[in-house]
């Protein structure tokens, strides 16, 4: 039965990769499913020879078991960490950047913007910080794309603060902090900031926000597109551990 599961998973992972590639043109990090899928299929083909190398096979099982335990625990934290606090009022709403398709918000960015709009339209006194610089293949900054989208959907431009220098989540928080403190003329630790990002990204954002001096934060997260969930949450596993170890 276990052998059948290994083969089935290998086939499913491989099909999933090609599904994303054909239907959506591929998404970042989806290649891992192709690699793992092929490895599982190859293992199924050569499993008898692999099992003959008893020491190697035993060590391999231990390594895989440890990795799976860490993976499951980490994913559980990512999945179940609180993601929405609409009731909590904040003076500033910070939207974390995502990729731009030339000048148009990507699916992920649009999800964050639509989520932000829900909050902004019922909280007239809240300012919004759009955070994100210009990435590879992007004709305008992520901040500009977000600002244009918000204005198009009825948000007064005077409520919008642009942060257009950041290139990653750590810098989103670092540079937005300067913008918020400059605008409010107050220390960030004295302000309530609500952060808008995507569901898989909340836990890591909380860690990075805290490291950058955001003491009073809450979240209002958009939902990931169902087709992208396996890739997004797998990618976030590695990104979270990178943040825990390196992003200071």
Please report, for each region that a protein language model flagged, where it lies by residue.
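Short hydrophobic alpha-helical membrane-anchoring segments
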Residues: 16-21, 44, 70-79, 244
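Membrane-interface helix-boundary motifs at transmembrane edges
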Residues: 24, 46-59
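Internal/C-terminal transmembrane anchor helices
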Residues: 55-77
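A structural signal for short, hydrophobic/glycine-enriched beta-strand patches
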Residues: 73-234
């Amino acid at each position: 039965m276990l052998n059948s599961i290994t083969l089935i998973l290998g086939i499913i992972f491989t099909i999933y990769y090609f599904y994303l590639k054909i239907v959506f043109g591929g998404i970042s990090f989806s290649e891992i499913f192709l690699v793992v899928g092929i490895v599982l299929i190859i293992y199924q083909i050569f499993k008898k020879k692999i099992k003959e190398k008893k020491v190697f096979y035993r060590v391999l099982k231990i390594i895989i078991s440890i990795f799976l335990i860490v993976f499951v625990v980490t994913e559980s934290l990512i999945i179940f960490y609180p993601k929405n606090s609409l009731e909590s009022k904040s003076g500033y709403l910070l939207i974390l950047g995502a990729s731009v398709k030339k000048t148009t918000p990507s699916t992920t960015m649009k999800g964050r913007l639509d989520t932000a709009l829900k909050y902004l339209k019922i909280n007239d006194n809240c300012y919004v910080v759009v955070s994100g610089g210009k990435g590879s293949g992007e004709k305008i900054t992520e901040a500009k794309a977000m600002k244009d989208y918000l204005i198009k959907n009825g948000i007064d431009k005077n409520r919008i603060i642009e942060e257009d220098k950041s290139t990653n989540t750590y810098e989103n928080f670092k540079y937005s902090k300067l913008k918020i403190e400059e605008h409010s003329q107050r220390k960030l630790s004295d302000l309530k900031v609500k952060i808008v990002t995507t569901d898989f990204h909340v836990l890591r954002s909380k860690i990075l926000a805290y490291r950058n001096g955001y003491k009073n934060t809450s979240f209002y997260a958009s939902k990931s597109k169902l087709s992208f969930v396996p890739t997004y949450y797998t990618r976030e596993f590695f990104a979270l551990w990178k943040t825990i170890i390196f992003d200071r």
